[in-house]
Swiss-Prot record:
InterPro entries: aa-tRNA-synth_II/BPL/LPL, B3/B4_tRNA-bd, DNA-bd_dom_put_sf, Fdx_antiC-bd, Fdx_antiC-bd_sf, NA-bd_OB-fold, Phe-tRNA-ligase_IIc_bsu, Phe-tRNA-ligase_IIc_bsu_bact
Protein localization: Cytoplasm
Domain FDX-ACB positions: 710-802
Classification via SMART domains: B3_4, B5, FDX-ACB
Protein's UniProt name: Phenylalanine--tRNA ligase beta subunit
Primary residence: cytoplasm
Gene name of the record: pheT
Organism: Leptospira borgpetersenii serovar Hardjo-bovis (strain L550)
Length: 802
């Protein structure tokens, strides 16, 4: 938005204050400024001169030599203009002037010195076309020696305001509103208030008809006669041009002028056109779907039912608050008009803008939310401006219309302690009263309690709560005057989130230590995928309509991880992934939602792989990884139990048991499941219930398991036995552990073999047991004694030695 300093000076003496002071106060207390520029400063080098004489050029038939007078001296100009004569007042660009890309220099034309150039309106960028030098004879204000910039009222400073910084301040979208704000901030008086304009309405004139409804906050119309449509006076033209508004004629220009001055849009209808429709009967109503009529911008959009229209005798003549109709617009021969001044709900104007795609200067102001009581004062001001701008004898009927909330008030209650606490400084009641009254609030105190009546131009959406008052006081006093002090806050040890802490440990160990990659999946999946793990009847269905493959919440993570492997099986030979995720069940809380830590591994073994040795090695490798993870999170007492699962191969399905509770599982995914997911390779899948894992870890995390290393050499005993093809290898290690051999530190399976000389249905399993003595070196006799004990234990329990 562009604001003219000269225009704002009509309302308060801003020119008496230094420009630097104004700019600093705007930046600190009002809004952001994109730029401050003088308007058309190049026209200071173009003066009005009078042609004293004209002579033919001695060496060029189409050139003339003119002697001109600028009020203090004479100079010689060579010109090719044919429309000038002695005595004419014309604009002269003197040497040093820059007009567009052209710089005027003192030069010689065919041997004759020329000290400048006569200018046309086009050369001065005042018109798109011109027929010759601009002749200024008889034009008001055209005086010899005056600069064109002064003649055109262009001697001005333009403030370019950042619109987004005043979106919440509709009162600042006008010259008077901004001047009023600056007057408050700089302690300047208001010398003229356009909202206090007076006008004597002609009570004998026929009144227009306005149908009252709830489609506008306020709507008034007045009939105006003895109107003459002519070009606007220079003052009006220049002020509109400085704000980037196109000049049209004196009537339309006044409508734009009053909008820029007071922030309230108005509209003029050609009364003769309205009467041709059967009389003047205006109404605010909604469009009919598909309705269309020509607008001022030559478009005819198809309208939606949510768009507000102005109708006359039921026919559309304007899109309310956005743009007028072409047929009802003021014409060059218009002598009577109907003036409209209205305020519409901002949300309705926003819908019209969105639907039509039209964003006008009027709609920009309406969408911010205007104060409804301004409609009548704006009519009075516009009538005064029309009279000043070429319609000296106009008459106007008394405005007719409605105002729904004439006595709306917003009162805010707070106390001095609240204000000072929020600002972080100590202000007295006098300080607060001074600031608020300068901002046009009405203030009253009862002890430390404050009541502030918000001015009408601020109470719609801007200032409504005590915090808004604090902001007004703070910005007016100046945020730069508030001393920066460090915040005082109690330092507390943060509460440990054990679940989050263990989750980070798990992710770090699996990704950094074991080379797994973390994956993220949606919780939506197909109902048939929930059949893999659990009761499908407990599936949680998604209420809003979804595709069949995303119709329920998952009850385990196996389907998600298998789909991840399917996506990547042709890209990588080995896939190791894990996911932290939730599973959902249609049962009462808190068991309706569980968090799982699940993982899946594919070692590039085809689903038809029949080499049991390779498959068992892969499985033992993954199991060893999980056991190292359990040790990492301080879970030392556990065992693996054979437990069939429908999604696991019956020969490779284990449950992890800790403290007699199952906390997870591990196994080869069943070939039928692999086929259903179109998987070409064997997959090992495992899952741990995370809440149970957290509980066990929390119990064990402070227990020290450190053992002082023995100073004596360790010993190892290997033993190989035959066990059933489907028997758990833990059976023998559990038997050994229960014997409580003092020197026995640990035991594990280090190899397995099936086929060859091994009987059918059996497999050869080799165990290794580590022996540690803290008191003396092992003797061969003691090692043999323990070895014989293990052999006897195996035979006693039906195991055959290899």
């Amino acid at each position: 938005m562009k604001l003219s300093l000269d225009w704002m000076n009509d309302f308060t003496p801003l020119k008496e204050v230094g420009l630097d002071v104004i700019l600093k106060k705007i930046a600190v207390s009002v809004c952001e400024i994109d730029g401050v520029v003088p308007f058309r400063p190049e026209l200071d080098f173009v003066k009005i001169v009078r042609i004293e004489s004209l002579d033919k050029h001695p060496s060029a038939d189409k050139l003339q030599i003119a002697e001109v007078f600028d009020g203090s001296s004479k100079s010689q100009i060579v010109t090719g203009a044919t429309n000038v004569k002695v005595g004419d007042l014309v604009p002269l660009a003197i040497p040093g002037a820059k007009l567009g890309d052209r710089e005027i220099l003192e030069s010689e034309l065919r041997g004759v010195k020329s000290s400048g150039m006569f200018c046309s309106e086009k050369e001065l960028s005042l018109s798109e076309e011109s027929s010759g030098v601009w002749i200024l004879n008889g034009i008001e204000g055209a005086e010899i020696g005056k600069t064109i910039r002064s003649f055109l009222y262009y001697e001005d400073i333009i403030f370019e305001i950042d619109n987004k910084s005043i979106t919440h301040r509709p009162d600042l979208w006008s010259h008077f509103g901004f001047a009023r704000e600056l007057a408050s901030q700089l302690r300047l008086p208001i010398t003229f208030n356009p909202f206090e304009s007076l006008w004597n309405f002609d009570l004998s004139m026929k009144l227009p008809r306005v149908l009252e409804n709830q489609n506008a906050h306020s709507y008034y119309a007045s009939s105006i006669c003895e109107v003459f449509v002519i070009p606007s006076k220079r003052k009006f033209q220049s002020r509109l041009q400085k704000c980037g508004i196109r000049v049209i004629n004196n009537v339309v220009d006044v409508s734009n002028y009053v909008m820029l001055e007071m922030g309230q849009p108005t509209h003029f209808f050609d009364k003769r056109f309205l009467e041709s429709q059967g009389g003047v009967s205006l109404e605010v109503s909604y469009a009919k779907k598909g309705e269309s009529f020509a607008l001022l911008d030559e478009t005819s959009p198809s309208l939606e039912e949510e768009i507000l229209l102005i109708r006359n005798q039921g026919r559309p003549v304007a899109v309310a608050g956005v743009m007028g109709g072409k047929e009802s617009a003021v014409q060059n021969n218009t002598t009577e008009i109907v003036m409209e001044s209205a305020v519409f709900a901002r949300e309705k104007i926003r819908k019209s803008i969105r639907s039509t795609g039209i964003r006008s200067d009027s709609s920009v102001r309406y969408e911010k939310g205007l104060e409804a009581t301004t409609t009548l004062p704006v009519i009075r001001r516009a009538l005064n401006l029309l009279k000043e701008n070429g319609c000296p004898s106009l008459k106007a009927s008394e405005p007719v219309g409605f105002l729904h909330t004439p006595h709306k008030e917003v009162r805010i209650h707070t106390d001095i302690h609240f204000i000072n606490t929020k600002l972080g400084i100590t202000l007295s009641q006098g300080d607060i009263t001074d600031i608020l009254e300068r901002l046009h609030f009405m203030v009253s105190w009862k002890g430390d309690r404050l009541e502030a009546l918000v001015p009408k131009f601020r109470h719609n959406y801007d200032v409504t709560i005590p915090e808004d008052l604090v902001e007004e006081i703070g910005r007016t006093r100046g945020y730069d005057t508030i001393q920066v002090t460090p915040l005082l806050a109690e330092i507390k040890t943060p509460i440990r989130n054990l679940s989050r802490e263990l989750e980070r440990k798990c992710k770090t160990f699996f990704s950094v230590g074991l080379g797994y990659h973390e994956v993220y999946n949606y919780s939506f999946q197909a109902l048939k995928e929930n059949e893999l793990d659990g009761d499908v009847e407990l599936s949680v269905k998604i209420r809003n309509e979804m595709p069949e493959e995303q119709s329920v919440l998952r009850n385990s993570l196996i389907s998600s991880l298998l789909k991840n492997i399917r996506t990547n099986q042709d890209r990588f030979s080995e896939i190791k992934i894990f996911e932290f995720g939730r599973a959902y069940f249609n049962i009462p809380e808190p068991d309706n939602e569980k968090k799982f830590f699940s993982f899946a591994v594919s070692f590039d073994r085809k689903s038809s792989e029949s080499d049991l040795g390779l498959l068992e090695d892969d499985f033992l490798k993954v199991r060893k990884e999980i056991e190292s993870f359990l040790k990492y999170i301080r879970i030392f007492e556990y065992f693996w139990d054979i437990k069939p699962e429908i999604f696991f191969h019956p020969g490779a399905s284990l449950s992890l048991i800790v403290d007699s509770k199952q906390i997870g599982n591990l196994g080869y995914v069943h070939p039928a499941v692999l086929d259903s997911f179109e998987l070409k390779k064997r997959v090992i899948y495992g899952s741990l219930e995370f809440e149970k894992l957290v509980e066990i870890w929390n119990t064990n995390r402070n227990i020290s398991r450190f053992n002082v290393p023995s100073q004596f050499p360790e010993a190892e005993i290997d033993i190989s036995i035959l066990i059933g093809e489907k028997e758990n290898t833990n059976l023998f290690t559990d038997l050994v552990r229960r014997e409580k051999i003092p020197e026995l530190q640990e035991g594990w399976v280090y190899s397995q073999f099936a086929g060859g000389s091994v009987p059918v249905g059996k497999r050869s399993v080799s165990y290794r047991f580590r022996l540690v003595n803290y008191e003396k070196t092992f003797t061969q006799e003691r090692i043999k004694e323990i070895s014989d004990h293990l052999v006897a234990l195996a035979g006693k329990n039906g195991f055959v030695l290899r």
